[in-house]
Amino acid sequence: MSEETLAYIESVIAERRKASPEDSYVSSLFHRGTAHIAQKVGEEAVETVIAALAQDKKSLESEAADLIFHLAVLLADRGSSFENVFSELRRREGVSGHAEKAARPKS
């Protein structure tokens, strides 16, 4: 999936966000709030893991698409985007995963 594809998905989400919740699934997600959207991301993540463990490539791809879509909705809901995620990934490029994790603030 290219950055252009994700940008297109984000533009569709932004447009559908303006629609009536009765007419648009995307709008209904925003209408129900961040907690509901986050729950949907969690559900799709679990379904993706289950499909992967079942070694069902087609289901894995389908569930991964659902996960990416719902993640895009969550990012939009929180005022973020995949571009910001890509910037963070670029920032981490060349940094050891262990070193990056160790440098994070302790919570």
Swiss-Prot record:
It is found in: Cytoplasm. It holds the Pfam family PRA-PH. InterPro entries: HisE (IPR008179), PRib-ATP_PPHydrolase-like (IPR021130). It is an enzyme of class 3 (hydrolase). GO terms for cellular component: cytoplasm. Its EC number is 3.6.1.31. It catalyses: 1-(5-phospho-beta-D-ribosyl)-ATP + H2O = 1-(5-phospho-beta-D-ribosyl)-5'-AMP + diphosphate + H(+). GO terms for biological process: L-histidine biosynthetic process. Keywords: Amino-acid biosynthesis, ATP-binding, Cytoplasm, Histidine biosynthesis, Hydrolase, Nucleotide-binding. Pathway: Amino-acid biosynthesis; L-histidine biosynthesis; L-histidine from 5-phospho-alpha-D-ribose 1-diphosphate: step 2/9. GO terms for molecular function: ATP binding; phosphoribosyl-ATP diphosphatase activity. Belongs to the PRA-PH family. This is Phosphoribosyl-ATP pyrophosphatase. It comes from Zymomonas mobilis subsp. mobilis (strain ATCC 31821 / ZM4 / CP4). The gene is hisE.
